[in-house]
Swiss-Prot record:
One of its GO terms (cellular component) is plasma membrane. The gene is lypd6. This is Ly6/PLAUR domain-containing protein 6. Interacts with fzd8 and lrp6. Its main location: membrane. Residues 1-22 form the signal peptide. Keywords: Cell membrane, Disulfide bond, Glycoprotein, GPI-anchor, Lipoprotein, Membrane, Signal. Coiled coil: none annotated. It is found in: Cell membrane; Membrane raft.
Length: 174
């Protein structure tokens, strides 16, 4: 047999193996996130969250999540994970939310149906990739102080009070 047909077979097999898709994992990776990460936003501080309502599992939620920016009034990504008594996922809900919706994170006890619910919130672009499964995961994680505007408004009265007390003390000493 001449070498050319053998080489042609080798090239053809190489091309065919490139067409065959490998089995893909049912979880998203950080590499997938890089493709979803925006280069521009519709408004300053704009971000995206995975969003779904009562998806059967995390993969289906993340896979079919619409690629939309969160509304301006939202600041966090929320995840609600309902599990059966043995830890299998019953449903997943993810969405963009304001601060008020993130004040009750954590896990509930098993209810009368044998289900447990864990909720988590996070701040950042597409930060709600994983599911909360226990108290360690079901947290509220932020990248900035939650009450930034309230801190500055509380600091001024405290400063004025401190200055007033100090001046009264100094005045009474003299």
């Amino acid at each position: 047999m001449e070498p050319w047909p053998l080489m042609a077979w080798g090239l053809m097999l190489t091309a065919i193996t490139g067409w065959i898709k490998a089995v893909q994992s049912r979880d998203f990776t950080e590499k997938d996130i890089i493709f979803l990460h925006p280069s521009t936003t519709p408004y300053p501080g704009g971000f995206k969250c995975f969003t779904c309502e009562d998806a059967p599992d995390n993969y289906e939620c993340n896979r079919w999540a619409p690629d939309l920016y969160c509304p301006r009034e939202s600041r966090y990504c929320y995840t609600h994970h309902k599990m059966s008594w043995d830890g299998n996922t019953v449903s997943v809900t993810k969405r963009c939310v304001p601060l008020e919706d993130c004040l009750q994170t954590g896990c509930s006890d098993i209810d009368h149906e044998g289900n447990r619910v864990c909720t988590a919130c996070c701040e950042g672009n597409i930060c709600n990739l994983p599911l909360p499964r226990n108290e360690t995961d079901a947290i509220f994680s932020t990248t900035s102080p939650i009450n930034r505007s309230a801190q500055s408004t509380q600091t001024l009265p405290l400063l004025l009070l401190s200055v007033s007390i100090t001046s009264l003390m100094l005045h009474s000493i003299n």
